[in-house]
């Protein structure tokens, strides 16, 4: 026999399952496909895919030379919280050979910090007008230039954090993911809850998380 779950516990497991569902659909693919390569995976996440245009941050303390910081959505100025990048572009500005200023839209290429030193010394991959590199730094995207141009705007399409489920205080706000995903999310919540019951070592961790939330 299993005990009845308190509303706070139900909220916890539903939100854990919802978050896991989104993260798995975005990243977990044994065939190494992106989530948009299958129609179901695209449909699963379409409600939490959004896009925004970001201007350079007022606070500029870039870590790398010629870096420009753009503040990622974190819920401070709106409800959206950035999770995963899908597509990135930027608008650069440079002075051409005639002394005129040119605005141009180009792609942005994500790199890892471990690869930075290698790429900046590579004549074919270092930052350039048509090769704008991007590092993540705390709550910022740091776009890298070669110093001959600046960046006016950062165009970001991304997966955002889904709205938190709260059956106690907001019972009228349903799961915002596509309707066909709801049964999978509930099933995932049930599975995790039952696994928690079967593994007592998780009980203290569960109580601690509920207290923190």
Q: In which residue ranges do the predicted regions lie?
A:
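Glycine-enriched, solvent-exposed interface loops adjoining structured elements
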Residues: 1-213
């Amino acid at each position: 026999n299993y005990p009845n779950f308190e509303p706070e516990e139900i909220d916890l497991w539903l939100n854990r399952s919802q978050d896991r569902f989104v993260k798995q659909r975005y990243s977990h693919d044994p065939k190494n496909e992106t989530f948009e390569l299958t129609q179901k995976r695209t449909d699963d996440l379409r409600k939490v895919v959004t896009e925004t245009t970001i201007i350079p941050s007022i606070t500029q303390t870039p870590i790398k030379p010629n870096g420009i910081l753009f503040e990622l959505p974190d819920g401070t100025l709106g409800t959206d919280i950035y999770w995963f990048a899908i597509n990135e572009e930027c608008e650069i500005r440079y002075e051409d050979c005639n002394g005129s200023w040119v605005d141009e839209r180009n792609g942005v290429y994500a790199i890892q910090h471990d690869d930075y030193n290698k790429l900046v010394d590579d004549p074919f991959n270092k930052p350039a007008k048509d090769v704008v590199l991007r590092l993540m730094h705390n709550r910022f995207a740091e776009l890298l230039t070669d110093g001959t141009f600046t960046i006016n705007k950062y165009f970001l399409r991304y997966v955002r954090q889904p709205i938190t489920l709260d059956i106690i205080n907001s019972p009228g706000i349903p799961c915002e993911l596509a309707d066909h995903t709801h049964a999978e999310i509930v099933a995932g919540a049930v599975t995790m809850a039952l696994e928690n019951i079967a593994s007592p070592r998780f009980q203290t961790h569960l109580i601690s998380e509920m207290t923190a939330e």
